[in-house]
Amino acid sequence: MIKSCETSLKSYPNDCDEASILQYLADISIHNNRDWFHENKDRYDEVHAAFEQIVSNLIDALSVFDPEISLVSVKSTLYRFNRDTRFSPDKSPYKRHFGSYINPKGKKSPHGGYYLHLQPGNCLIGGGAYCLESPILKAVRRNIVDDIDEFRSIVEAPEFKNLFPVIGEDHLKTVPVGFDRNFPYPQYIRPKNFAVMHKLPDEFFFNEGWITEVAKYFKIMKPFLDFVNHTIDDYI
């Protein structure tokens, strides 16, 4: 078990790897400089290895209902911890979170996948298709209009709506150009991306069975992913 070093304003229990990960991330959010990082490199190596094991376990859990996921390697889902500061006013060299985007098509694919984000006070799960190019985005919207009954049966299902009440992170103010202004469900074609997320308290990840629970959430999300991904498949 990783031992945490409680040097930040936030203090986590030291009896599980998830708490040690969050403790480290809380610490580096305060001491976000290269000297501190290198002085605590052993801690980083330990918590990052623990996060890789978490992702491996999550891949196994998702593979039960999404067999394509079994082919995904842990490394392919992870992101660099160093920040790209070239165009940012924030020159902090390191991120304040660990993230994993589990997508059999790869992180850079337009296809949607499953996302896990660990960050003190801002942990979440999510998924869907981000940063879609305009023609693909239009195709997804068009498919929603053409198959609105199927789409509504997915996103208005009580289990889904309870976890993911909002589709998309940013939205147009009006119906997109080229679509019927009288379409009765404009909220489903106004999103600028087709992603969903569900925030979770830090303490959620201290429970032994949290990966099983998150896998259940992702299973509920899968029909939404399938709808979006099938449209992308048809377009590409």
Describe the residue ranges of each PLM region.
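Acidic, low-complexity proline/glycine-rich segments
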Residues: 2-21, 188
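N-terminal low-complexity, intrinsically disordered segments
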Residues: 2-7, 87-95, 202-205, 212, ...
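Contiguous, amphipathic alpha-helical segments that mediate oligomerization or scaffolding
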Residues: 20, 26-65, 216-235
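Extended cationic-aromatic binding surfaces that line active-site or macromolecule-binding grooves
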Residues: 49-105
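Aromatic/basic-lined ligand-recognition segments
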Residues: 81, 173-186
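Aromatic- and glycine-enriched beta-alpha-beta binding-site module
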Residues: 84-145
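Compact, glycine/acidic-enriched structural inserts
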Residues: 120-179
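Charge-rich, low-complexity terminal tails
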Residues: 183-236
